[in-house]
C-alpha cells in the first residue's frame, strides 16, 4: 500500500482527542493544508491545541460545512460518528473519509500488524500480545490502548511489527488497513447509543476481517457465535481459541487458576505436536484473563514468536493498571485495584476471578451508578464476599440489592472504606476495589480513583 501524497492537499481532521491530534500532526508534516474542527471550545481543548503545529487552522465551538465539502480528505476521530451531517455531506461530494488508523496504515507499507478487537478484554490481550512479540522483534503497541498508530509514523522509529487495539469506532473508518493477524475476542451488546442494534455494532467490528488477504490469519473465540461468524468471513486462514476449543490450530486451557499450582494453555499447531504453556502469573487471574492469554499465545505463535519467548513473556507480564492489579500486600492481605470495573459486568468478572469457598474478599463498591441493577452479582457473593463496603452516590442502591448477602457498611468515601477494610481483613484475605460504578461523583476518572486506592492501600499494608 503506497503512502498517500498529501502535499498541498486540503485535509480536515474532525475531533481533537489523541488520535485527532496525531492525525493532524502527521498530515501537516506531509505538507497538507490542515484544518482541525471540534464542537468543543478552546477552554476544553487547551492541551490538544498546544500540541498542534502553528500552520494548522483551528475551527472550534462548531463545524463549518465548507471545511468538509471543500476538503480533499476528511479524517474522523473515533469519537465522531460517521453519520455526522457534515461527514455525510463530504461523502456525497465524493470526499474520502478515513479514520486515523487508516491514515497511519497507509504510511506503514508492509509492516505486519496484529489487530485485536472485541467487546471486553481488548486492552489486556493487546498488551500481552505486544509483550510476547517484543521478546522476538521490535514491536509497537497502541491504537485504542493509548498511543495512536500515527505516532509510530511520526516517530520514525523502526518497528518490525505492530499490535493494535481496535474499537468498533476505529474500524468504521478503515478501507485498506490490513491486519496480518486479526483477532476478535467476543461480541456482546455495547455502544448502543451509537449503533441501532448489536448487529450494526458487530458489523463495524467485522470490517477488520473484510480487508484481509488469503495469506492472512483470522483468530476468533470458538465459543462466541458472533465472533466466529465474523472471523469466518475472512479470506484468511481461520484459527480458534477458547475453553475446549477444537483443533486444528487452536489454543485452549486445562482449567485451574494462575498462582501456586497454576494452569496451562495448550497450542496445537497444524500437523505438529501440541505445545503446553504454563500460566502461573497472578496478573492473569480469572477465567476472562485465561481466555485473553489463550488469544495472545495464539496470535504470538502465529506471528512466529518462539515457544520459549512466549513462556517467558507470560511469566513476566505485569498486567494493566486498574484491572485486577495487585497494588499492595502486607499482613497476609492482598490489596487489588479493579477501578476499571465501571459497570456490573466488569465487577462480575473481577469477583469471579477469586475462588469460592471460605469468604475471603472484602469488597469495596460504589460511585456514580449507571442505572443498571446490581442483582446479577448475587450468585457470586456466597462463599466469596466476607464484607461489603459501599462508597459514593449509588451506595444506597448497592446496599438495598446486595446488603443481605454479607456484612455491609456504608463508608462514604474511598479513604473511609480502605480504613475499614484494613480492620476487617486478615491473613489470607483480599481487599478488592471493584466499584461497578463510574468515578465521577468523587474522582475525575477511574484512573484517579485507582491511584488513590493504590496510595491508601500501600499505607495500610506497611
UniProtKB/Swiss-Prot annotation:
GO terms for cellular component: cytoplasm. Its main location: cytoplasm. Pathway: Cell wall biogenesis; peptidoglycan biosynthesis. Keywords: ATP-binding, Cell cycle, Cell division, Cell shape, Cell wall biogenesis/degradation, Cytoplasm, Ligase, Nucleotide-binding, Peptidoglycan synthesis. ATP binds at residues 118-124. It catalyses: UDP-N-acetyl-alpha-D-muramoyl-L-alanine + D-glutamate + ATP = UDP-N-acetyl-alpha-D-muramoyl-L-alanyl-D-glutamate + ADP + phosphate + H(+). GO terms for biological process: cell division; cell wall organization; peptidoglycan biosynthetic process; regulation of cell shape. One of its GO terms (molecular function) is ATP binding. Its EC number is 6.3.2.9. It is found in: Cytoplasm. InterPro entries: Mur-like_cat_sf, Mur_ligase_C, Mur_ligase_C_dom_sf, Mur_ligase_cen, MurD. HAMAP family: MurD. Cell wall formation. Catalyzes the addition of glutamate to the nucleotide precursor UDP-N-acetylmuramoyl-L-alanine (UMA). Belongs to the MurCDEF family. This is UDP-N-acetylmuramoylalanine--D-glutamate ligase. It comes from Anaeromyxobacter dehalogenans (strain 2CP-C).
Amino acid at each position: 500500500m503506497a503512502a498517500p501524497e498529501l502535499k498541498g492537499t486540503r485535509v480536515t481532521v474532525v475531533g481533537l482527542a489523541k488520535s485527532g491530534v496525531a492525525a493532524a500532526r502527521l498530515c501537516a508534516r506531509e505538507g497538507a493544508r490542515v484544518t482541525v474542527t471540534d464542537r468543543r471550545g478552546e477552554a476544553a481543548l487547551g492541551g490538544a491545541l498546544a500540541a498542534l503545529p502553528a500552520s494548522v487552522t483551528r475551527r472550534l465551538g462548531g463545524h463549518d460545512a465548507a471545511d468538509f465539502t471543500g476538503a480533499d480528505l476528511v479524517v474522523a476521530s473515533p469519537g465522531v460518528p460517521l453519520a455526522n451531517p457534515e461527514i455525510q455531506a463530504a461523502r456525497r461530494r465524493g470526499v474520502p473519509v478515513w479514520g486515523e488508523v487508516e491514515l497511519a496504515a497507509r504510511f506503514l507499507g508492509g509492516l505486519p500488524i496484529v489487530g485485536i478487537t472485541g467487546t471486553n478484554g481488548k486492552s489486556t490481550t493487546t498488551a500481552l500480545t505486544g509483550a510476547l512479540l517484543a521478546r522476538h522483534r521490535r514491536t509497537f503497541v497502541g491504537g485504542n490502548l493509548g498511543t495512536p498508530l500515527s505516532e509510530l509514523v511520526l516517530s520514525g522509529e523502526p518497528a518490525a511489527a505492530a499490535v493494535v487495539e481496535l474499537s468498533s469506532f476505529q474500524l468504521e473508518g478503515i478501507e485498506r488497513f490490513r491486519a496480518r493477524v486479526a483477532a476478535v475476542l467476543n461480541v456482546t451488546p455495547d455502544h448502543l447509543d451509537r449503533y441501532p442494534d448489536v448487529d450494526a455494532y458487530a458489523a463495524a467490528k467485522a470490517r477488520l476481517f473484510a480487508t484481509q488477504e488469503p495469506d492472512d490469519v483470522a483468530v476468533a473465540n470458538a465459543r462466541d457465535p458472533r465472533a466466529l461468524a465474523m472471523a469466518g468471513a475472512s479470506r484468511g486462514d481461520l484459527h480458534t481459541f477458547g475453553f475446549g476449543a477444537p483443533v486444528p490450530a487452536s489454543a485452549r486451557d486445562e482449567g485451574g487458576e494462575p498462582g501456586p499450582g497454576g494452569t496451562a494453555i495448550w497450542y496445537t499447531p497444524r500437523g505438529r505436536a501440541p505445545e503446553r504453556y504454563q500460566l502461573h502469573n497472578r496478573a492473569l487471574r480469572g477465567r476472562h484473563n485465561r481466555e485473553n492469554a489463550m488469544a495472545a499465545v495464539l496470535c504470538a505463535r502465529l506471528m512466529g514468536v518462539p515457544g520459549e519467548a512466549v513462556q517467558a513473556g507470560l511469566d513476566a507480564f505485569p498486567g494493566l493498571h486498574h484491572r485486577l492489579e495487585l497494588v499492595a500486600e502486607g499482613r497476609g492481605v492482598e490489596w487489588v485495584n479493579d477501578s476499571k470495573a465501571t459497570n456490573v459486568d466488569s465487577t462480575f468478572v473481577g469477583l469471579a476471578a477469586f475462588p469460592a469457598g471460605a469468604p475471603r474478599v472484602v469488597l469495596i463498591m460504589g460511585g456514580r451508578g449507571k442505572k443498571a441493577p446490581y442483582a446479577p452479582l448475587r450468585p457470586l457473593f456466597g462463599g466469596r464476599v466476607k464484607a461489603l463496603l459501599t462508597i459514593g452516590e449509588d451506595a444506597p442502591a448497592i446496599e438495598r440489592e446486595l446488603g443481605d448477602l454479607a456484612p455491609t457498611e456504608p463508608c462514604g468515601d474511598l479513604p473511609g472504606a480502605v480504613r475499614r477494610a484494613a480492620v476487617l481483613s486478615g491473613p489470607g484475605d483480599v481487599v478488592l476495589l471493584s466499584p461497578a460504578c463510574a468515578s465521577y461523583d468523587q474522582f475525575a476518572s477511574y484512573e484517579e480513583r485507582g491511584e488513590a486506592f493504590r496510595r491508601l492501600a500501600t499505607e495500610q499494608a506497611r
